[in-house]
Swiss-Prot record:
Protein name in the entry: 2-dehydro-3-deoxy-D-gluconate 5-dehydrogenase
Name of the top EC class for this enzyme: oxidoreductase
A Pfam family: adh_short_C2
Keywords recorded for this protein, A-Z: Carbohydrate metabolism, NAD, Oxidoreductase
Catalytic activity: 2-dehydro-3-deoxy-D-gluconate + NAD(+) = 3-deoxy-D-glycero-2,5-hexodiulosonate + NADH + H(+)
Length: 254
């Protein structure tokens, strides 16, 4: 049974892998046997922490930089990475941003950047990498969704809209590609101890309210995403399509 979870010989492209959830996923995939292509807006091209940790596991790592809010930069990255890696087996759409402002003050610049990074770039990357997977009749695409795929959030209208759309995109792509050998799914993190939640964790009242709703009684951490990512990237999930896997300590069950 364990061989179904092996990613030996696979190549995984992980966006937003410099730190946090993306780094945790990249390391989990490497631990399962995959070589890693990492890309983030500010990832060091050589010598990054994630590269060093992947290589310490005996796996290969190639780093790229890309500003996912810049359409031209995105297409240039796609052209480069496809030339360097003709066969990408696993795509993890994890790169994202969150910009906070009350809806009445949420300017076009904030809205556009969040939608470009969290939705538009992820569709384009999935389309361009996914078409190669469809041609081979084999591939795995994993999106990072959110609790706000299901809930509205507070003072993050662009983020909530983008993550709600990701839930629909996962199902839309799955409807087209599940019968063509490509599994498209998502992981929805709960409240995780990362840079994105620093303001919440430092707000003692808000942090206490959040912890009070999580049945497991703790914030999540990047290591909590290794197992779910390996599962969705592996043959063990060959009949899983269009799913959004909650990794939230039980939050959505309350």
């Amino acid at each position: 049974m364990l061989e179904k979870f092996s990613l030996e010989g696979k190549v995984a492209l992980v966006t937003g892998c410099k730190r946090g959830i993306g780094k945790g996923i990249a390391l989990g995939l490497a631990e399962a046997g995959a070589d890693i292509i990492g890309v983030s807006a500010s990832l060091a091209l050589e010598g990054s922490d994630v590269e060093n940790e992947v290589k310490a596991l005996g796996r290969n790592f190639k780093g790229y930089q890309c500003d996912f809010s810049d359409r031209d930069a995105l297409y240039a990255f796609i052209k480069e990475v496809k030339a360097d890696f003709p066969k990408i087996d696993i795509l993890v759409n994890n790169a994202g941003t969150i910009l906070r402002a009350p809806a009445a003050e949420h300017g076009d610049d904030l809205w556009d950047k969040v939608i470009d990074v969290n939705l538009n770039s992820q569709f384009i990357l999935s389309r361009e990498i996914g078409k190669e997977m469809v041609a081979r009749q084999s591939g795995k695409i994993i999106f990072t969704a959110s609790l706000l795929t299901f809930q509205g959030g507070i003072t993050v209208p662009g983020y909530a809209a983008s993550k709600g759309a990701i839930g629909q995109l996962v199902m839309a792509l799955s409807n087209e590609w599940a019968g063509k050998g490509v599994n498209v799914n998502a992981i929805a993190p709960g409240y995780i101890d990362t840079d994105n939640t620093q303001a919440l964790r430092e707000d003692s009242e808000r942090s206490a309210a959040i912890l009070g709703r999580i049945p497991q009684g703790r914030w999540g951490n990047p290591d909590d995403f290794k197992g779910p990512a390996v599962f969705l990237a592996s043959d063990a999930a060959s009949y899983v399509n269009g799913a959004i896997l909650l990794v939230d300590g039980g939050w959505m069950g309350r």
